[in-house]
């Protein structure tokens, strides 16, 4: 997991060939004024989703993780909190991995929580199980999906 401010994104753009195109797009567009939906940057290799997510309490949050994609998440309208837990520490899955949706959900209670404000981002790699959308009200946010590259 990486947490940083948008101004520092150049430091990590070399970690994946699609990071640079995603961050260039984020920096040159007013995402908060865009309609909810998917924005293709490089087809299924890199795309954004603008979402209006209903905030939830920490005890209602559900851990998720992905195998094919890396998530870059950034709140646009207000602070958003996230739970995090290493994949190696997870307990029982709620259901088997959904190949089409690229997600697995877990029953573990959320314990470690951090909060981001607009202009800050988090990168969740496949080993980073996360519980997004912790907060109050409707949270406008951006979720970039970046195809994982095997080394």
Regions found by a protein language model. Give the residues of each.
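A short, N-terminal "cap"/entry segment at the start of jelly-roll beta-barrel domains
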Residues: 2-50, 57-65
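Conserved short histidine dyad/triad with adjacent acidic residue
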Residues: 48-66, 76-90
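Short, conserved beta-strand element in jelly-roll/cupin
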Residues: 68-80, 86-88, 95-102, 145-147
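Conserved metal-binding segment of the jelly-roll/cupin
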Residues: 114-129
């Amino acid at each position: 997991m990486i947490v940083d401010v948008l101004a520092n994104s150049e430091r990590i753009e070399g970690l994946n060939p699609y990071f640079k195109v995603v961050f260039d797009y984020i920096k040159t567009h007013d995402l908060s004024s865009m309609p909810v939906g998917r924005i293709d940057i490089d087809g299924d290799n890199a795309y954004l989703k603008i979402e209006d997510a209903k905030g939830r309490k920490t005890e209602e949050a559900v851990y998720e993780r992905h195998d094919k994609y890396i998530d870059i998440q950034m709140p646009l309208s207000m602070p958003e909190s996230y739970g995090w837990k290493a994949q190696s520490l997870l307990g029982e899955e709620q259901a088997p991995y959904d190949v089409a949706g690229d997600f697995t959900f877990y029953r573990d209670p959320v314990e470690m929580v951090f909060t981001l404000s607009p202009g800050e981002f988090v990168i969740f790699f496949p080993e980073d199980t996360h519980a997004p959308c912790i907060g109050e009200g409707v949270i406008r946010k951006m979720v970039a999906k970046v195809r994982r590259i095997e080394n």
